[in-house]
Amino acid sequence: MELTSQTTQVATTQAATTQQEHVRGVAAEHASRHARVIRSAKDGRLLSALMLPFFAVRPPSGYGVITTTGRRTGKTRRKCVRVIRRGERAYLVQLRPPVLALERPSAIAAWVWNIRANPNVRLRMRGGTFAGVARELTEPAELEQAREAMCDTVNLFDYGECDLHLRGLPTRAKIKELHGYWFDTGVPLVVELASQGLS
């Protein structure tokens, strides 16, 4: 029994190390194409705080506000996110900009830690506010569905996102490349939406 436990721990550690190496490799490949605007988790929090008043009123297509419960405080926490809805599922990704991914490839944002502690969330997006249950994606079939939704969908606001994060003029191809980078280095999640919206 103890040998099985040790074998499982070794396999888990090896998988985590392999994932971190993958994230670092992708980040190194893309780093030169990214602008240096968002370099840390603090920069991301600041950007989210600046967008929050606007997104809370009327989020643009492909974006929204996720509300989690703080794992330590129990208070509600809101974060602006890119979110793509497919039926009763909404896909989102925790981002790791290249500078962060190179330094800390396993970095987890506070809102993801909150979801791990309490997966019940509210999601404000086009179409209303929805209660839901969030979880990280690990199954290959679900990851492929999420990748298609997140990387192949381009909305008008994505051009501004691309202009902020990548060097040069934004194009549809560059937006898809940026979203592919976020997906490959980030933490993909799904929110299973309740059938009735809250508002």
Language-model features, listed with the residues they occupy:
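Short beta-strand segments
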Residues: S61-V99
